[in-house]
């Protein structure tokens, strides 16, 4: 018989463990977790809320349903310290997911270094990713406590994407009023700028007014536009006629009369 025919027969001799119940004992008790000896290759970490129906003591024995057996590798990895570290990381991940789903989505951390497309941020033992577009200011504060908000979490690859909110000096975690929340989220600099804007009176730079000719050059510029409107009185018309004639004769003497013939024609017609 070939290997492909013998292999399924060999596996069929083993009883499948998934879905079955075995007798277990507690090895170690801690604040929120229990180290359980299943009699298999490795012990299993259980949380207290999973074992509420059974009294949690060192002498307790109970039936435990197998879902997934996790192998750590070499026997050295079965020491309690690596197991504690892994359990703590699981508890921290649960707390971070609670913060991410809550209304007050704020976490403290600091920027480690720059990576491709952004920065690496250390948050509670996890390394999160901060894109450059979500950085609050151009100046990067390395190894300083900053406030971040969690945008996305992927438990399969332990990926966390964050956004920078501000520095760690302001108490962002204290309950605030609705009109104060926006200023605190944006940071201390923007709040200071808004207070300065309220206290200062902004003056208008531009004031629109009618143009009044005051010099000879401005008077000549207005006369090129043509005669005055008909609303003026006869005395004003006479003064304008005399002034335009005098200006035309002066310009003719200077050799610029050809370009200003239309002014003389207008004065003759009037």
Swiss-Prot record:
Q: Its principal location?
A: mitochondrion
Keywords of this protein's UniProt record, alphabetized?
Mitochondrion, Ribonucleoprotein, Ribosomal protein
A GO CC term assigned to this protein in UniProt:
mitochondrion
Cellular localization per UniProt: Mitochondrion
Region Disordered: which residues? 218-250
Q: Which family does it belong to?
A: Belongs to the bacterial ribosomal protein bS1 family.
Q: What is this protein called?
A: Small ribosomal subunit protein bS1m
What gene does this protein come from?
RPS1
């Amino acid at each position: 018989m070939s290997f492909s025919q013998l292999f399924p027969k060999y596996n069929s001799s083993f009883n499948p463990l998934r879905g079955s119940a075995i007798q277990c004992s507690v090895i170690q008790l801690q604040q929120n977790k229990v180290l359980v000896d299943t009699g298999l290759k490795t012990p299993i970490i259980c949380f207290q809320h999973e074992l509420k129906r059974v009294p949690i003591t060192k002498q307790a024995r109970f039936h435990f349903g197998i879902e997934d057996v996790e192998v750590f590798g070499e026997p050295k990895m079965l020491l309690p310290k690596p197991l504690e570290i892994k359990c703590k990381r699981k508890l921290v991940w649960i707390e971070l997911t609670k913060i991410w789903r809550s209304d007050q989505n704020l976490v403290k951390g600091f920027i480690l270094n720059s990576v491709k497309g952004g920065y690496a941020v250390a948050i509670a033992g996890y390394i999160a990713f901060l894109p450059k577009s979500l950085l609050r200011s151009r100046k990067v504060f390395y190894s300083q406590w900053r406030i971040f908000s969690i945008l996305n979490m992927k438990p399969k690859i332990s990926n966390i994407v964050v956004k920078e909110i501000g520095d760690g000096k302001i108490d962002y975690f204290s309950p605030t009023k609705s009109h104060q929340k926006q200023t605190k989220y944006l940071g201390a600099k923007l709040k200071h700028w808004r207070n300065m804007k309220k206290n200062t009176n902004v003056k208008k730079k531009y004031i629109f007014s009618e143009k009044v000719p005051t010099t000879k050059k401005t008077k000549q510029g207005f006369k090129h536009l043509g005669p005055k409107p008909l609303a003026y009185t006869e005395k004003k018309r006479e003064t304008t006629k005399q002034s335009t004639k005098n200006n035309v004769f002066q310009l003719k003497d200077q050799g610029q009369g050809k370009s200003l013939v239309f002014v003389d024609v207008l004065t003759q017609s009037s």
